[in-house]
Amino acid sequence: MSGLWRLRNLKSLALHARSISPVSNLYSLELGSCPRRRIQERFKSEQGGGGGGGDDFPVPVTRRKLRAEPNCPRCSKQMDLLFSNRQFPSSNLLQRPDDSDSSGAGDKTNFQSVNFCPTCKTAYGFNPRGVSPLQGTFIEIGRVQSPTTTTTNATTSKSTRKQQQHSKDPNQGFNYRNKLRSSFWDTLRSYGAEPPEDWSPPPPHSPLNSSPPNTIPVNASPSAVDTSPLPDAVNDVSRWGGAGLGRDFPTPKEICKWLDKFVIGQSRAKKVLSVAVYNHYKRIYHTSMKKGSAAQPIDDDDNVELDKSNVLLMGPTGSGKTLLAKTLARLVNVPFVIADATTLTQAGYVGDDVESILHKLLTVAEFNVQAAQQGIVYIDEVDKITKKAESLNISRDVSGEGVQQALLKLLEGTIVNVPGKGARKHPRGDHIQIDTKDILFICGGAFVDLEKTIVDRRQDSSIGFGAPVRANMATSGVTSGAITSSLLESVESADLTAYGLIPEFVGRFPILVSLSALTEDQLIRVLVEPKNALGKQYKKLFSMNNVKLHFTEKALEIISKQAMVKNTGARGLRALLESILTEAMFEIPDDKKGDERIDAVIVDEESTSSEASRGCTAKILRGDGAFERYLSENKSKDATEPMVDERVGSAKAMRL
């Protein structure tokens, strides 16, 4: 009895599937044959019942699912396709146009299957048009832009008129689409899978919509679409720069002027970095133009292959190494990532592999491989991975020399398999191949006591530079910043090798740049002049509560002197300002009116002179007009007030 009942359902299924012709056709599927072990997979009926039910029970609706393994239309990865005879509500979207003329019009059963791709998190509806072999049409759930979907199969004018008759109500297709979505979630929960991500369609002006409506852009993920207005191309993630700027790429002088707006001092380092970045992306641009042209070079000299030149920055902490690299990446608009060399270990040990650096770069590039292959990688604290001194310890140096050896091919240029999910390498995991030959690597480090190695190499401890260095080392143990900077300018590869870097690692950095320690005057300029100056940052922070912030010239001098004593460079300035302004920032958020309202905060000589005792705080002026009264009482020719014009975001200095 059970066999007869199954045979009857199979005949009905084949009869209806043969009579269906798809109206919407986004993606077509044709499977010539399916493995026998995947042909039938039976599930119990949702409504219960059996084959021998009595008259008191309704006829059971049995759902049979046939499993196939086609490729996903979006990501081309393998996915499971479940074909069932679940009955959906009929509509003009999924019902074939000439149902009214077909035999058995009263039984309008649409054989549907709602499927989910686990790789790209995309949901599809499946309309079959043949069972043996299985043929049908994919409909992407949530991406249908109109009640009627474009069809690739030519239809007659008669069927078109009948389709228009089915869609007289303009909201009919939209309402059915919502019903289809709700049915999809019910079916998906029964499969035990997680719902896909909510990917909104790209805006009309987005580059992703430049393709025809029935095509999907390649190498573009919906998460890369930013619907918010962007003021300039620097923050536009949908259009990367680098070699793509072509002849519009800034010249070294233009790059140096841009760096002057953000970094104080370091004129020689700015020139060297400007030339290095310009030559790097000019090489990539001309190489791509050469590959794109079909003409063969006449002279053999045109076939010269240009290698990249990585950069090694050396300088004390707070001198601007990281800021220089970050500002360069922002100017040329390429993906930029900062890696810490102290967290890297050799492959197979606890810690981050060197491939994790490329995965971070790929993440910043929104998984755009072409953009990531022209990015900038800054590896900080590279002086901390020097090899250990030879001793009785025979264990492997996995965080020192082992990391240097692992970085060799990465710096030179090779194809690296990056794990897709950022985990360690797995033989069966998905990998993304990245070519590092066009990635600019900038390494930086403080290289403490490197000047001692330079003095030993020069062998002039009695005269010249060696005499003051030896004298300072003998008396105080610390050399002056000017002498140290002069010695670092004459650094050579042999000095770095003696410091603990292996020769192969040093050879990957033909450009050696030394940065000098900031002077007291330069620290004062750091507080007021750059676009991202600390004084402007705190003034903007206070202005959010309608409170004015004022620095006197004497206070700026005292703050810079205290930062020089700390020997932490520009980083010490923020710590000092936080200590001085903490009490004011604690009181300001309280909403008070009248004489209790905070009108301004003053940082003067008295607020900064006792910083060493941790008892100094900025002066708080309360009441309307308190700031104007303070200015009139303390008017001085030498006092300056750095102010922030919020309308244009530029800095001004107003004489009080």
From Swiss-Prot:
Keyword Cell division appears in the UniProt entry: no
One Pfam family of this chain: AAA_2
Main localization (coarse): mitochondrion
Alphabetic keyword roster: ATP-binding, Hydrolase, Mitochondrion, Nucleotide-binding, Protease, Transit peptide
Chain intervals with Basic and acidic residues compositional bias: 634-649
Transit sequence range: 1-44
Subcellular localization: Mitochondrion
Biased composition range(s): Low complexity: 146-158
GO MF annotation, one: ATP-dependent protein folding chaperone
Keyword hit for Hydrolase: yes
Region (Disordered): 142-177, 193-235, 634-656
InterPro entries, per database record: AAA+_ATPase, ATP-dep_Clp_protease_ClpX, ATPase_AAA_core, Clp_ATPase_C, Clp_protease_ATP-bd_su_ClpX, P-loop_NTPase
Biased composition regions of type Polar residues, renumbered to the chain: 216-226
A GO cellular component entry from the record: mitochondrion
The protein's role, per its UniProt record: ATP-dependent specificity component of the mitochondrial Clp protease. It directs the protease to specific substrates. Can perform chaperone functions in the absence of ClpP.
PANTHER family referenced in this protein's UniProt entry, alphabetically: ATP-DEPENDENT CLP PROTEASE ATP-BINDING SUBUNIT CLPX-LIKE, MITOCHONDRIAL, ATP-DEPENDENT CLP PROTEASE ATP-BINDING SUBUNIT CLPX-LIKE, MITOCHONDRIAL-RELATED
The family this protein is said to belong to: Belongs to the ClpX chaperone family.
Name of protein: CLP protease regulatory subunit CLPX3, mitochondrial
Source organism of the structure: Arabidopsis thaliana
Taxon lineage: Eukaryota, Viridiplantae, Streptophyta, Embryophyta, Tracheophyta
